[in-house]
Amino acid sequence: MSNYKFETLQLHVGQEQADPATDSRAVPIYQTTSYVFRNSQHAADRFGLADAGNIYGRLTNSTQDVFEKRIAALEGGVAALATASGAAAITYTIEALAQAGDHIVAQKTIYGGSYNLLEHTLTQFGITTTFVNAHDLAEVENSIQPNTKAVYLETLGNPNSDIPDIDAIAAIAHKHGLPLVIDNTFGTPYLIRPIEHGADIVVHSATKFIGGHGTTLGGIIVDSGKFDWKASGKYGNIAAPNPSYHGVSFADAAGPAAFVTYIRAILLRDTGATISPFNAFLLLQGTETLSLRIERHVENTKKVVEFLANHPQVEKVNHPSLPDHPDHALYEKYFPNGGASIFTFDIKGGKDAAFKFIDKLQIFSLLANVADVKSLVIHPATTTHSQLTAEELEDQGIHQGTIRLSIGTENINDILADLEQAFN
């Protein structure tokens, strides 16, 4: 279906024809733990990766398979792996690339949970991270060490929607034989496809825009199929015979899909952050309307940004669409159709004013999720990024007066009226 446009792909990939077992037009929920093999040789071929297909519910499921194929197609990748959450997708990606004694270079203005994973949790397993100003290309390159295994970015930083120069950083990573990993949760494949700009691996918290309705946890890892694991010489777990899977070289057995096949066969097998069939089904429902929802998110966001930029109680609006934003040129390059419906602004009066404003909102829900059809709000310094030190918060541009908004799809006049009454 490669000739079809995004809006068609989001509806059909993975189930081009009706379900063969039931003739169902909708993707069925295959609520099963196990699959019957035709005979002993068939079972052996499945376990030996000689025959693609279901082995056990912790590894694959037919509902999950449709979801994976669909997101891979939307991102322009060769294969994907769905997980129980976005955090699991990010963790598996790093664990597949780095082992004890290895190093990651990461953009410092990322989601607080990802920052904490890299800064604290993974250090317990011997993986260290250098956080960099992604706008300083020299700093990015100079931070690469002999034991560096990946460069990690977000298409739109959390919470301030800052934008890295993906093309330039991809060139740096590839110069050093490293894959570029990009979290495209906030960008979505409808607005930007990082693989087209040099990304090798794309991750999502599918809980956000892909699901879109605040009902379902899930994550997904997309393999571009473009990184040469053998030529790099740094990833023996993928390119060389793997003793944990009877000597299989995943680069040989799975070809372009080696990366996600390794995660499925080893990390998912051993640690089990498996997405449920029901969650995969719900995320498919969200995927079918992704383009329609994103268009409304973007349209509403433009008007909210304009409203806030002209409000006397607002000190600063952190949105790259504004001409005076330092990433405005990158925004125009990478997001020609708009974007960044999750962003922050600084209210005058600091924390007290921020709390008062948030507590007066009526349509906006105060919660930790983002990218819902409903408008959402939170105070990052005391919640999502509260694990960061005062220095780290300042370094990421998060102040006591910073408020994060996630603009939903409600009527724009109702959204603006709610914001205005909260200021008053």
Identify the residue ranges that each predicted region occupies.
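Short hydrophobic/aromatic beta-strand micro-patches
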Residues: 222, 344-346, 406-408
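Short conserved active-site loop signatures built around small residues
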Residues: 1-30, 221
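Conserved small-domain helix->loop->beta segment predominantly found in fold-type I
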Residues: 271-274, 278-280, 285, 289, ...
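Conserved PLP-enzyme active-site core in the AAT-like
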Residues: 2, 14, 18, 80-311
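Glycine-centered tight turns that cap/initiate beta-strands
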Residues: 76, 147, 313-316, 363, ...
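Active-site beta-loop-alpha junctions enriched in small/polar residues
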Residues: 156, 185-187, 322, 348, ...
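PLP-dependent enzyme catalytic core of the Aspartate aminotransferase-like
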Residues: 119, 128, 146, 293, ...
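Conserved N-terminal alpha-helix of the aminotransferase class I/II PLP-enzyme fold
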Residues: 39-88, 113-120
